[in-house]
Amino acid sequence: MGETVPRRRREDEKSIQSDEPKTTSLQKEVGLISGICIIVGTIIGSGIFISPKSVLSNTQAVGPCLIIWAACGVLGTLGALCFAELGTMITKSGGEYPYLMEAFGPIPAYLFSWSSLLVMKPSSFAIICLSFSEYVATPFYSGCEPPKVVVKCLAAAAIMLITTVNSLSVRLGSYVQNFFTAAKLVIVAIIIISGLVLLAQGNTKNFENSFEGAEVSVGAISLALYNGLWAYDGWNQLNYITEELRNPFRNLPLAIIFGIPLVTVCYILINISYFTVMTPTELLQSQAVAVTFGDRVLYPASWIVPVFVAFSTIGAANGTCFTAGRLVYVAGREGHMLKVLSYISVRRLTPAPAIIFYGIVATIYIIPGDINSLVNYFSFATWLFYGLTILGLIVMRFTRKELERPIKVPIFIPILVTFIAAFLVLAPVITNPAWEYLYCVLFILSGLVFYFLFVYYKFEWAQKISKPITMHLQMLMEVVPPEPDPK
């Protein structure tokens, strides 16, 4: 018994299952098609089917509304091309995290992981699953809203199922993503084809004088861009799993080049389809635009719309879990989270502890009554980190010239995206100042307290608490440390 104690005390440096192979690591099982499906499947969630009215409400006219949707697609593509350079230059999973680490050091990277892992990503995951559960439960409660308890229980079950699938197998998770992406493209095709047929039949009244009454103020345009970009969010998801991409130098940029323009074309055509059967006023009054479209165009087969929207939301939730779990994994590997979160399942070769942690935090977020306001105020932080990351790309052009760049975008692209990101961060604060933005900034900065206590100084008492927890979780989950951080 006495001989085993020292081995347990050294578990942070060496696995307690020290006879495991040294090559335990994430496997490269995501190809080009799966990469495109992850991008398309994560971007196209419930937003384009339920609330495209948010862009219209700020532009007040059909013409500017369609221009905003196109502009958001172009901006997403430009941002993703910058991330393609970063992803092929620094071939590590974790999205913005390793890029901020290389460009600016550990503190900005830690603050990104702190705010992303505890608020932005799990709360978004929870909202997507709540949206899915509402669509599933509503048909069983005709004439009234489904009980909150039912919706939350279904959302918790969805989170548990998605977490389990992605913990079991990378390949299974990507197959599930491919299936749901195909399903959502079916409903996208149905809406687009129906709209084009109606357009060919002469339903063009809503496109006449399409710029009349347009709102062109800075505040209105910034809010319209915010709402449009929310529907495009997910364009950087493939960078979270770079280490699992086959031939990332080829497949990462190709998936971006094919995936995001495809989404952009779909979004514009879907909006055109909506306007063939609804006036701007009717669209603004609709609670679920795609359902209204289905009732008017697809009856008596209109039931397929909520079914496929449910498929779309669960696909977006799966893509979010698949990629965000890797951020937890990389943060744990760098010592910015509990070490056990960076461990890999011996049997499944998945970052199971990271995915399970992400699922638990997301489940906590479905308990409160309304978390939309929290996410809305943190959405500006998303573009804060996007802008900071792309600024890091510009900085590394001068400070890290020795790094190989298989893809090198023209310098004006990251400069343009950085300026737009700064505009998106500052515009809502200036045009509609609120204390919540200050609270958001204070929360992000509060991560510094935990950074210096648990990461920088590494107090002995914290290590004594974490070591036995890590050891027991490692034995319970049959996980081991990964290979050394790829350089």
Curated annotation (Swiss-Prot):
Protein name: b(0,+)-type amino acid transporter 1
A Pfam family annotated for this UniProt entry: AA_permease_2
GO biological process, any: neutral amino acid transport
Membrane topology listed for this record: Multi-pass membrane protein
Family note: Belongs to the amino acid-polyamine-organocation (APC) superfamily.
Top-level taxon in the UniProt lineage: Eukaryota
Gene name for this UniProt entry: SLC7A9
Assembly notes: Disulfide-linked heterodimer composed of the catalytic light chain subunit SLC7A9 and the heavy chain subunit. The heterodimer is the minimal functional unit. Assembles in heterotetramers (dimers of heterodimers) and higher order oligomers. Interacts with CAV1.
Localization in the cell: Apical cell membrane
Keyword Cell inner membrane recorded: no
Keywords: Amino-acid transport, Cell membrane, Disulfide bond, Membrane, Phosphoprotein, Transmembrane, Transmembrane helix, Transport
Ranges for region Disordered: 1-22
